[in-house]
């Protein structure tokens, strides 16, 4: 698990003009601590890429599995994909807005074992308040699952 803050390894935008709502925090404050639900997935890294995608790496343990510790349960896989897409939207909105997932579709292509995983998200279309995103999950360079989601952007309460 990440030990230093901020937990998202990002080139932070300049603080002027990027303040978050009422408590006057900038985007670096938003990503300062790992949210509790991400600790369950054992998040290990998060960062934007040069080609306008966002990567989140996880290393789920056996506590998230069924089948005698061999397969990560599909709901947790879905959660990791959703997390990657959501964190990308938060990053792109500089923390001023957060996404609410309206729907998510996941295709499971291979079993997901405990251990290192890499999720990659991109934004396929972004409107004023509705965004369409996609994410893929890889393990050992093999495609495990794909997802697409519709998200409604709302003002950040933070």
PLM feature spans:
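Intrinsic disorder/low-complexity segments, especially N-terminal tails and targeting/processing regions
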Residues: 10-12, 18
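Terminal targeting signals and extreme-terminal segments of soluble enzymes
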Residues: 17-158
């Amino acid at each position: 698990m990440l030990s230093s803050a901020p937990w998202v390894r990002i080139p932070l935008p300049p603080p002027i003009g990027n303040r978050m709502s009422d408590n006057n925090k900038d985007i670096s404050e938003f990503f300062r601590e790992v949210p509790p639900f991400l600790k369950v997935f054992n998040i290990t890294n998060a960062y934007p890429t040069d080609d306008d995608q966002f990567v989140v790496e996880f290393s789920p343990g056996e506590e998230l599995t069924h089948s005698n510790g061999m397969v990560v349960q599909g709901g947790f896989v879905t959660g990791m994909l959703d997390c990657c897409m959501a964190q990308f939207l938060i990053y792109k909105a500089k923390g001023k807005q957060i996404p609410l997932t309206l729907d998510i579709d996941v295709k499971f292509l291979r079993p997901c074992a405990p251990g290192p995983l890499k999720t990659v998200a991109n934004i396929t279309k972004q409107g004023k308040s509705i965004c369409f995103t996609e994410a893929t999950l890889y393990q050992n360079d093999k495609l495990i699952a794909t997802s697409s989601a519709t998200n409604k952007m709302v003002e950040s309460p933070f």
